[in-house]
């Protein structure tokens, strides 16, 4: 779990997302509260429930990007799902409990990596011995092993060469475990236990014996380290720790939640809208979900929902779900100045990406201050005249602007291009001013 302070989290988000201070502060505080809660006494800790967040803002202003960056900072089980992918229980499609099952799978992977990291040194020692055994096979008979000191010295010489990398390119024959093939079984709701038993049965039946392969020592060493580390991990402890991690630190990001709002009076069942909201209620409130790794309680999982709410309002969500998303954060629409900052300030910004890409062809590209202002203004104008898709418009505008350079770069190694206001005007003015062209091209 991340121990970063709210200020540090916001600083990290600032490196990738422009503006939206309210949203950044809210998710930073929510993430820090996960850590604060774990510092409390066990009895009191159970009473502290997470304050779920609803982020409201137009498309392309940074809602999903905040989720992506938060996943990297959280150092905890984190899953981002689209609310539109689910249907009500009893109908064809994914049910919402699958969110928790997927989150548990993520936690299992995260915990396995952590445990394998802890025993990596021991795994390296075991892998080293196996490679030395392949290089210096043990004698089959006692009479062949009369000079043990010589054999030991030879082994130490090879060990030293192996550690120094002198044997990396030498090929050896070694037995490597075959990867297990996963089998996905579709089952009706309520029959997950039977599905898990069937999967375990097929898994045990399908265990393939180790296969002898010829490979370079450098590749073999990596494979053997992974294999030996996996042997050292206790699977039961792994599952217990992963489930504990999900229950105490898990974060679910529900994107496009506005798309499951009920719009107007409709007849018939709302399989993908209000029905999904009703199914989400017990998850957000706290319930127990059956997974193939064990029972998972959702009482302390943090839910962050987001939506553009252009065709619907937050009040169109069913009241019970509204009450379970107590923190509301509104994200601001982006201005031309924001676009200008997006082009230059974030780490690996769009302009830096194009400069680096063209640099691989030996072409130098320079964006001037006036050029960046013109690009930002063009993107903002197109958003105002047509559909406002936020910062995503910059990708379309930049791709159109750089189209000729990208096409000719391979033939113009050593050339230099300056993207200034005149260059932008020559390539984009006609498209920006013609609303029909803007609608179909930009």
From Swiss-Prot:
InterPro entries: AAA+_ATPase, ATP-dep_Clp_protease_ClpX, ATPase_AAA_core, Clp_ATPase_C, HslU, P-loop_NTPase. The keyword Nucleotide-binding applies. Keywords: ATP-binding, Chaperone, Cytoplasm, Nucleotide-binding, Stress response. ATP binds at residues 18, 60-65, 255, 320, 392. GO terms for molecular function: ATP binding; ATP hydrolysis activity; peptidase activity; proteasome-activating activity. Belongs to the ClpX chaperone family. HslU subfamily. PANTHER family: ATP-DEPENDENT CLP PROTEASE ATP-BINDING SUBUNIT CLPX-LIKE, MITOCHONDRIAL-RELATED (PTHR48102), ATP-DEPENDENT PROTEASE ATPASE SUBUNIT HSLU (PTHR48102:SF3). This is ATP-dependent protease ATPase subunit HslU. It comes from Shewanella sp. (strain W3-18-1).
């Amino acid at each position: 779990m991340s121990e970063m302070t709210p200020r540090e989290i916001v600083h990290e988000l600032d490196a990738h997302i422009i503006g939206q201070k309210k949203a950044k502060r809210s998710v930073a505080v929510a993430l820090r509260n996960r850590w604060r809660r774990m510092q409390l006494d066990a009895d009191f800790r159970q009473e502290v429930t997470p304050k779920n967040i609803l982020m409201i803002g137009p498309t392309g202003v940074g809602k999903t990007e905040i989720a992506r960056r938060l996943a990297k900072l959280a150092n905890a089980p984190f899953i981002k799902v689209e609310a539109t992918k689910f249907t009500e229980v009893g109908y064809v499609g994914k049910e919402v409990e699958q969110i928790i099952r997927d989150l548990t799978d993520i936690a299992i992977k995260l915990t396995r990596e952590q445990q394998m990291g802890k025993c990596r040194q021991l795994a390296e020692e075991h892998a080293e011995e196996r490679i030395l055994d392949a290089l210096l096979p043990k004698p089959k008979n006692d009479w062949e092993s009369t000079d043990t000191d010589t054999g030991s010295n030879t082994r130490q010489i090879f060990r030293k060469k192996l550690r120094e990398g002198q044997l990396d390119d030498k090929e050896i024959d070694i037995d490597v475990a075959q990867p297990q093939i996963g089998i996905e079984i579709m089952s009706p709701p309520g029959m997950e236990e039977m599905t898990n038993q069937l999967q375990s049965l097929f898994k045990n039946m399908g265990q393939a014996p180790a296969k002898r392969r010829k490979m370079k020592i450098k590749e073999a060493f990596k494979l053997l380290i992974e294999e030996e580390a996996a042997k050292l991990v206790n699977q039961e402890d792994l599952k217990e720790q992963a489930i504990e991690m999900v229950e105490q630190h898990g974060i679910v990001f529900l994107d496009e939640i506005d798309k499951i709002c009920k719009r107007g009076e409709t007849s018939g069942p709302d399989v993908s809208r209000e029905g999904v909201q009703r199914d989400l209620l017990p998850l957000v409130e706290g319930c127990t979900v059956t997974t193939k790794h064990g029972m998972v309680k959702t009482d302390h999982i943090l839910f962050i929902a987001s939506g553009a709410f252009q065709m619907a309002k937050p009040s169109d969500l069913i009241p019970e779900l509204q009450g379970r998303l107590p923190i509301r954060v509104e994200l601001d629409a982006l201005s031309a100045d924001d676009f200008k900052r997006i082009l230059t300030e974030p780490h690996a910004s769009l302009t830096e990406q194009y400069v680096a890409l063209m640099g691989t062809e030996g072409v130098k590209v320079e964006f001037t201050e006036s050029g960046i202002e013109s690009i930002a203004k063009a993107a903002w104008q197109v958003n105002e005249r047509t559909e406002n898709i936020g910062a995503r418009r910059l990708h379309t505008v930049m791709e159109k602007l750089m189209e000729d350079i990208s096409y000719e770069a391979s033939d113009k190694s050593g050339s230099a291009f300056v993207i200034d206001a005149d260059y932008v005007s020559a390539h984009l003015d006609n498209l920006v001013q013609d609303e029909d062209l803007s609608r179909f091209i930009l």
